[in-house]
Amino acid sequence: MKIVVYHAEECDRKKCTSLKLGRKGKFKIVSSLNQLPRGALVLNPFSEKAVSPEDRDMVLRRGIAALDCSWKKVKKSSVIFQTARNHRSLPFLVAANPTNYGKPCILSTAEAVAATLYIVGLKDIASDIMSYFKWGPHFLDLNRELLEAYSRAENSLEVVEIQKKFIGG
């Protein structure tokens, strides 16, 4: 399974989770959008469709494409969000990384990819990715109840319903 990350060079390279996982051989880091795999699930915080277990086959066959950029600079108009299909957003989760600890929905690239893998039922791979960070296992523990609920949903609509119940929407 491919996990390909377009790196926008907007972060502190010493703290960058995707670069660390690239060095470990877990992520392929690319500098051109043309290098993203066709048909991959594209993590897009602006997508109206949430990641769900129904995306498992797509992830296994085509992989995951993510954008590593500053949350302060990410825009709906970003080229990556215009060039591909299969866009998915993540449902409500809380960050455990030191930069954004406790902030809802402001996940690192590693957290976002691990959450995607967990939700589609690839929990062992999600745990492996998080094991490269001291705080990584805590991300899974902190969000375990939600991740388990999302991973039992049938589809994106059910994931959104679970999220609404949790946050009171």
UniProtKB/Swiss-Prot annotation:
Keywords: Cytoplasm, Ribosome biogenesis, rRNA processing, S-adenosyl-L-methionine, Transferase. GO terms for molecular function: 18S rRNA aminocarboxypropyltransferase activity; S-adenosyl-L-methionine binding. It catalyses: an N(1)-methylpseudouridine in rRNA + S-adenosyl-L-methionine = N(1)-methyl-N(3)-[(3S)-3-amino-3-carboxypropyl]pseudouridine in rRNA + S-methyl-5'-thioadenosine + H(+). It is an enzyme of class 2 (transferase). Its main location: cytoplasm. InterPro entries: Tsr3-like, Tsr3_C. The keyword Cytoplasm applies. GO terms for biological process: enzyme-directed rRNA pseudouridine synthesis. Signal peptide: none annotated. One of its GO terms (cellular component) is cytoplasm. It is found in: Cytoplasm. Its EC number is 2.5.1.157. S-adenosyl-L-methionine binds at T17, L67, L90, T109. NCBIfam families: PRK02287.1 (NF002621). HAMAP family: TSR3. Belongs to the TDD superfamily. TSR3 family. Aminocarboxypropyltransferase that catalyzes the aminocarboxypropyl transfer on pseudouridine corresponding to position 914 in M.jannaschii 16S rRNA. It constitutes the last step in biosynthesis of the hypermodified N1-methyl-N3-(3-amino-3-carboxypropyl) pseudouridine (m1acp3-Psi). This is 16S rRNA aminocarboxypropyltransferase. It comes from Methanothermobacter thermautotrophicus (strain ATCC 29096 / DSM 1053 / JCM 10044 / NBRC 100330 / Delta H) (Methanobacterium thermoautotrophicum).
